[in-house]
Amino acid sequence: MCPCPYMHQAKPQQWHDAKLDFAESMSYGDYLGLDKVLDAQVPRSQQHNEMLFIIQHQASELWMKLLLHELRHARQLIDQGQLAGSHRVLARVLRIMEQMVSSWAILATLSPMEFISFRSDLGNASGFQSYQYREIEFIFGNKNRAMLLPHQHTPQIAKNLEQCLHTPSLYDAIIQQMTRQDLPICALRLDADPSEPTRSDASVEAAWVQVYRQPERYWDLYQLGEKLMDIEDAFRQWRFRHVTVVERVIGFKKGTGGTEGVEYLRKMLGTVLFPELWSLRSSL
């Protein structure tokens, strides 16, 4: 038999000018660490739908990681007085949050019986214990020392959250910048303990009223105010979609983390991150 004429030809090294041999160079998968990322989904049950549940939450944690990355950068820019530079960063923050809101639609395809089939395998694991989510809340000013307790078994995470608890919030940083534009803020507000949750302050509202009445004069602050409104709007939508999906999937059962489930999540809907930005509307 005649040997195949192509048998001894060298393997192609390119295809349409694309490099094909990565034996000695970095590939797409290498750069992204996909071996680790795609090996991180380890279902505890044999149920088909547990993979959806795991990937939904892991993907959310990745978006939260990016969200924190951008929020820290925005706060740094604001601390440096680069308000205009922070606008683009906060615009990205908003898009990330919109992505997180839309992702609830995927988890909503999980039926009650599909979730029940593997719920017991979660043990006490709950999104309530997400330390990245907690840090996001802290950066937004919703501080709560009790929320450090679920992380005492992981010292480095507990240390990071403790530091975040005592670091001025994004909103605190903006209020400090208001004083640099000769907007009077009460000393008690400026010297407030950063580990305490944001509380409404009359002097802050009065300052925001001036900003909104003269947007051309305080354009950078006005833009920051509107971006914070957009972000809190998206955050409320995220919370609401969370409540809706949980009620749709488990009804009013207790959460795996021990909370009252839907009832607890409904209470959280009342949280206001930037109170004066909402109340000023009534004062204009």
From Swiss-Prot:
Heme binds at H242. Binds 1 heme group per subunit. It catalyses: L-tryptophan + O2 = N-formyl-L-kynurenine. The keyword ATP-binding does not apply. GO terms for molecular function: heme binding; metal ion binding; tryptophan 2,3-dioxygenase activity. Pfam families: Trp_dioxygenase (PF03301). Its cofactor is heme. It comes from the Bacteria. Substrate binds at F53, I54, I55, Q56, H57, R119, T256. Pathway: Amino-acid degradation; L-tryptophan degradation via kynurenine pathway; L-kynurenine from L-tryptophan: step 1/2; Siderophore biosynthesis; quinolobactin biosynthesis. Keywords: Dioxygenase, Heme, Iron, Metal-binding, Oxidoreductase, Tryptophan catabolism. Its EC number is 1.13.11.11. GO terms for biological process: L-tryptophan catabolic process to acetyl-CoA; L-tryptophan catabolic process to kynurenine. Homotetramer. Heme-dependent dioxygenase that catalyzes the oxidative cleavage of the L-tryptophan (L-Trp) pyrrole ring and converts L-tryptophan to N-formyl-L-kynurenine. Catalyzes the oxidative cleavage of the indole moiety. Required for synthesis of the siderophore quinolobactin. Belongs to the tryptophan 2,3-dioxygenase family. This is Tryptophan 2,3-dioxygenase. It comes from Pseudomonas fluorescens. The lineage of its organism: Bacteria, Pseudomonadati, Pseudomonadota, Gammaproteobacteria, Pseudomonadales.
